[in-house]
């Protein structure tokens, strides 16, 4: 930080900068509190979502194993090929205290048997059940992915905000306080020297009676 002029105007300037930096640190702390509150809510949602995803995947794997046993892997593979599709995703961004956080949305993914690229009669009950469970798992996964992205973005912003707070409180504000003290001390010393010189001048040049 460059030194300010050792003048009363310089002292006022440094004190003004210190006030602005202090206000900035307080605002950043308030921002961090809001972001941390949002983050902890999201952590709870993500943990619940992961538990739901684990359950959905467990059901999907069990259903697939049963379908393989009853219908055979080759038949399931032949049904899976025409059932493949692209899933259109819509990514939107919302802001929390100016922090852009992405959100992922998709249309309903669970399809009826006649929407999977083959005649409904081609699907046995176990194969259709396995397909439905996997589509349900994908829906849960996309919901969690959106929250995970939001969580990661909030974590990054909280870390960046903490770095800025530390820089202000540990570097900028102490430096400004030190600079203000230096200027104030120099001005006081200058005032004392001026007072001494004035007394000497008056002693050498007394007023005529």
Curated annotation (Swiss-Prot):
Keywords: ATP synthesis, Hydrogen ion transport, Ion transport, Transport. HAMAP family: ATP_synth_D_arch. Coiled coil: none annotated. It comes from the Bacteria. This is V-type ATP synthase subunit D. Disulfide bonds: none annotated. The keyword Ion transport applies. Produces ATP from ADP in the presence of a proton gradient across the membrane. The lineage of its organism: Bacteria, Pseudomonadati, Myxococcota, Myxococcia, Myxococcales. Transmembrane segments: none annotated. One of its GO terms (biological process) is proton motive force-driven plasma membrane ATP synthesis. Gene3D superfamilies: 1.10.287.3240. It comes from Anaeromyxobacter dehalogenans (strain 2CP-1 / ATCC BAA-258). GO terms for molecular function: ATP binding; proton-transporting ATP synthase activity, rotational mechanism; proton-transporting ATPase activity, rotational mechanism. Belongs to the V-ATPase D subunit family. Pfam families: ATP-synt_D.
